[in-house]
Regions:
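Structured binding elements
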Residues: 106
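Phosphate-binding glycine-rich loop
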Residues: 40-87, 101-103, 111-113, 135-144, ...
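N-terminal "arm"/small-domain region of PLP-dependent enzymes with the aminotransferase-like
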Residues: 1-41, 374
Length: 399
């Protein structure tokens, strides 16, 4: 019987986790400083420093820390002027957070399929939908099927690789749309030399425990728009209008990151380059070692991209390999190697209405074939070689 392995389970001598944090820098020192000085809540020098260093890393003028990446997405949608009953184009092949954030503001997601080579939102499918399924009157763009206004595009950079953003930005310019980059899996990745989060009108990062750097839980909104940054700070601090009196003239949110967690983030940010190097080294060993196995397709890096390979996720072609991804997943977990499928595409989720969306056949295929392999920054060569050996042995046995 296959042992059930909990997400985020700690590593042990005979267990290889999917992704765990790497806390080996100044985390203890900075957190202790917060405790020693009693600066543990939502203001403090580490919050300021974490925002500053994230903005520098993203290549934007401003950054606003939030409690998580979903909160950053929620605020970004509000800044972009997305209203109830509007529609937002969003990647279908993604974790559910961006679709949920769209619903938080009363708007509706329109799911766009992935392109088959890099598994990111397909700009061609987005353009096809806007040109064929929408009506543009020179000032507003509306979905012909629902009658709703299209307000924004929310491309999600999945697995550490960028979406092809130039065509997305061109569509946004043509139809007066806002672009919200979901870079929650893309910190440190680059598109044509530009850091993710800096290409669209606003970008969002996540510092969840499985991300390339972590605060345990946290997020960040980045932008070059001073007015938006000021508004984000206002909304994330319960929309408080007076520094002394408790006066509120708008609905706000308790979304600010604590100084304690920001201290962790500062320490982690100091190690980001090292972490990216480790992720890319892990990806290279997987790619080279699995290259000759039938039906195993490695993730590809576009010539215009710099990927962090945050989560190494090959595709398993059942016809060529003789097995499907779920059988391989069970075999790995039976050998105490934590592997996971990718997310159910959002157009298949019963939580969201996809009736106004185009078809998404590529995402359906990717969902069936994808399997995420152990990708922790601290994954050693011996452990990774064991993962590779289990995969190779299982494919050989089944063929």
């Amino acid at each position: 019987m296959t042992e059930k392995l909990a997400p985020g389970a700690p590593p042990s001598a005979d267990f290889i986790p999917l992704i765990v944090p790497e806390l080996r820098g100044n985390e203890w020192k900075y957190v202790k400083d917060c405790l020693d000085t009693n600066w543990v809540s939502s203001v403090g020098s580490y919050v300021d420093r974490f925002e500053r260093t994230t903005a520098e890393r993203a290549g934007t003028k401003f950054a606003v820390a939030t409690v998580n990446g979903t909160a950053a997405l929620h605020i970004a949608l509000l800044l972009a002027g997305v209203q109830p009953e509007d529609e937002v184009l969003v990647s279908t092949l993604t974790f559910i957070a961006p679709a949920n954030a769209i619903r938080y503001v009363g708007a509706w997601p329109v799911f766009i399929d992935a392109e088959p080579k890099h598994l990111q939102m397909d700009p061609a499918r987005a353009a096809e939908f806007l040109e064929q399924d929408c009506r543009w009157d020179g000032t507003e763009l509306r979905n012909r099927h629902t009658g709703r206004r299209i307000k924004a595009i929310l491309p999600v950079h999945i697995l550490g690789h960028p979406v092809d953003l130039d065509p997305i930005m061109e569509l946004a310019s043509r139809y007066s749309l806002q672009v919200i980059e979901d870079a929650t899996e893309g910190l440190g990745a680059r598109y044509k030399g530009r850091n993710l989060g800096s290409v669209g009108h606003v970008g969002c990062f996540s510092f969840n425990g499985n991300k390339i750097i972590t605060t345990g839980g946290g997020g960040m909104l980045v932008t070059d728009n001073a007015e938006w940054a000021s508004r984000a700070r206002y909304l994330t601090t319960q929309a408080k209008d007076d520094p002394i009196e408790y006066v509120h003239n708008a609905v706000g949110y308790n979304y600010r990151l604590t100084n304690l967690l920001a201290a962790m983030g500062c320490a982690q940010m100091e190690q980001l380059n090292e972490f990216i190097e480790a992720k890319r080294r892990i990806a290279t060993l997987y790619r080279e070692s699995l290259a000759d196995l039938p039906g195993v397709r490695a993730p590809e890096e576009a010539e215009w991209a710099f990927s962090t390979f945050w989560m190494y996720t090959p595709l398993i072609d059942e016809k060529q390999s003789g097995i499907d991804s779920r059988r391989l997943l069970r075999e790995l977990n039976a050998n105490k190697i934590q592997a996971r499928p990718l997310w159910q595409p959002m157009h298949r989720s019963r939580a969201h209405d996809a009736s106004g969306s185009p078809s998404c056949p590529i995402a359906d295929v990717v969902h069936r074939q994808a399997i995420s392999l152990p990708s922790s920054v601290g994954l050693g060569p011996a452990s990774q070689s064991h993962v590779i050996e289990v995969i190779a042995s299982f494919l050989k046995k089944e063929n």
